[in-house]
A protein has these predicted regions:
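Conserved DEDDh/DEDDy metal-dependent 3′-5′ exonuclease domain
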Residues: 3-120, 126-134
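Acidic two-metal-ion nuclease catalytic site recognized across multiple nuclease folds
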Residues: 127-181
Length: 181
């Protein structure tokens, strides 16, 4: 990952998961193989990701292809009443379990993946697929219900900000009173 605005490193790893297996493809030394680009371009194969647009753009910088049948979980979870956008939080909401994100900010371009990196990458891909399949089993909320949830979430966020500001002002006032004495 890059921690500087506008700086992009080439995509170093592609994860392709089924419920039983996850395949990790290191792209650092070989680029994007034609066969993997063909999977992403195949309209008969659904691809699911989280913040998928950036991932697809990164892959397209390695080899041009026209993506087809790609689903971004961040674009659909709100239709199911989930306002969180991070994989760990979405997974916890749906399954009531926590997944580790300890290796998220790691160097995927290392010459060898550690066991922890491979486990993280595999879990990440499997969790994304599991969330998508779980959502397919339930009916999405109506547009009106989604809008209502978004408004409620925004109001709750404003309320939390107001409470934080009040707490800060109260602390500053108490500190000022203490200095007067």
């Amino acid at each position: 990952p890059s921690f500087k605005r506008g700086v992009h490193y080439p995509t170093a790893l592609v994860q392709i998961a089924t419920l039983e297996r996850c395949y990790l493809f290191r792209l650092t030394h070989v680029g994007l193989p034609v066969e993997i680009a063909e999977i992403f371009a195949n309209p008969n194969i659904r691809k699911v990701g989280l913040a998928f647009k950036d991932d697809i753009n990164g892959l397209r910088r390695r080899r041009d292809f026209k993506p087809a049948n790609c689903v971004d979980l961040q674009a659909i979870v709100c239709k199911y009443g989930i306002m969180e956008l991070g994989l760990q939080k979405i997974f916890a909401i749906i399954f009531g379990k926590k997944i580790s994100k300890a290796q998220q900010l790691t160097n995927w371009e290392n010459s060898h993946l550690t066991a922890e990196q491979a486990r993280y990458a595999s879990t990440d891909a499997w969790a994304t697929l599991s969330i998508y399949l779980a959502l397919q089993k339930v009916k999405p909320l109506s547009k009106k219900a989604v809008e209502s949830l978004k408004r409620a979430e925004k109001e709750a966020q404003i309320q939390r900000q107001m409470e934080a500001m009040e707490k800060k002002v109260k602390g500053e006032n108490e500190k000022a009173k203490g200095e007067e004495i």
